[in-house]
Amino acid sequence: MSLTNQNSKSKAAFERALPLMPGGVNSPVRAYKSVGMTPIFAERAQGSRLYDIDGKEYIDYVLSWGPMILGHADPIVTAAIQEQATRGWSYGTPTEIESAMAEVVISRVPSVEVVRMVNSGTEATMAALRLARGYTGKTKILKFEGCYHGHGDSLLIKAGSGVATLGLPDSPGVPAQIASMTLTVPYNDMDAVRIAFEKHGDDIAGVIVEPAAGNMGFVPPQPGFLEGLREITEQHGTLLIFDEVMTGFRVGFNCAQGHFGVTPDITCLGKVIGGGMPVGAYGGRRDIMEQIAPQGPIYQAGTLSGNPLAMAAGLATLTQLKPEHYEEFDRKANRLSEGYLAAAAKYNIPLTTNRAGAMFGVFFTDQPVTNFEQAKSSNLDMFRSYYQKMAARGVFLPPSQFEGLFLSTVHTDDDIEQTLAAVELTFKELQLEFNR
């Protein structure tokens, strides 16, 4: 099958970019190394569709890696950005729209009584760890294998996302002294968590976790896992931090914590809350958040934090989301899962799917995937071929086995059926290619 972008404007654009930026990109997964392709260079996007610079049209399940929950170029969000831009886009002094945005976040996220806006998910998680250490007086952080919390030094230990995509165990440049303050255990493994607390419980400031992991593929929590984390952290005076940068307002109307019924002490947000603009946030209990400067002694600041354009886009996004959207997400994700599994059974393709809300994951393995080691058992050669064939058929997927798919409010039933038709043809070819 011809991959049209391999001898195209995208190829020329990538060759131009290669000497200008590390690997030709500004974020590693965009290099498409793990799928053996030249990157698809976008020209524009509208609704559920993305168009490359050759004019090829794709059904988009990347959605800018999650933020575009209303689809691309939503007219209400577009109008909000344009209206704000006519009045300026950065002032260096407070604006009323920051309070309006904070009110919506606080009303929707069960754990958040006070919120601080920042510029990215990485900033949010870095600030949350500093806050946990400052509040508790403890130093160690417990995280989970395959969970990605941004590129802060102390969180690049056995991380997922692009780190897993490129096959990197950790990152050079992280001092051993910093790495030693991060404890790592398998996701969904409460026995391992208990052992870590038996050894280090008096010194663990925070447990940071994706309440549904989206950076080792999509892996939801097993029954009792989040509840177990809540219980053990309360027993030890440790703060529970939910990294909802990806799951926030995607897994549920009240985020993953509302969907699963477990309330952390601190929540990190990003992606959807900016409507596609650079943004992050962290919030939590009032007594914890009051420790942040200028109210308290724990310092964190940002020139562009609470940027009016980002606040306008985020507010216009969140106010359009309704509980019934999540019922539709569940229905469409269920149809995708059924269709994928039916095609896999028909053509003897090893496949497991996971889903929750507007997130969906596919693994080329017969075994259930509940942690990072199981995710890594997926057949990467098969994924690479699947990715290339689906792209050629006009379906834009995350170019990594270790990333999940995203749905938007504007993905139609016809989009889903077109996608499953492409899956059917692709799996038929995979059966022949891999002698299934």
Swiss-Prot record:
Its EC number is 5.4.3.8. InterPro entries: 4pyrrol_synth_GluAld_NH2Trfase, Aminotrans_3, Aminotrans_3_PPA_site, PyrdxlP-dep_Trfase, PyrdxlP-dep_Trfase_major, PyrdxlP-dep_Trfase_small. It comes from the Bacteria. The modification N6-(pyridoxal phosphate)lysine is found at residue 271. Its main location: cytoplasm. Homodimer. This is Glutamate-1-semialdehyde 2,1-aminomutase 2. It comes from Exiguobacterium sibiricum (strain DSM 17290 / CCUG 55495 / CIP 109462 / JCM 13490 / 255-15).
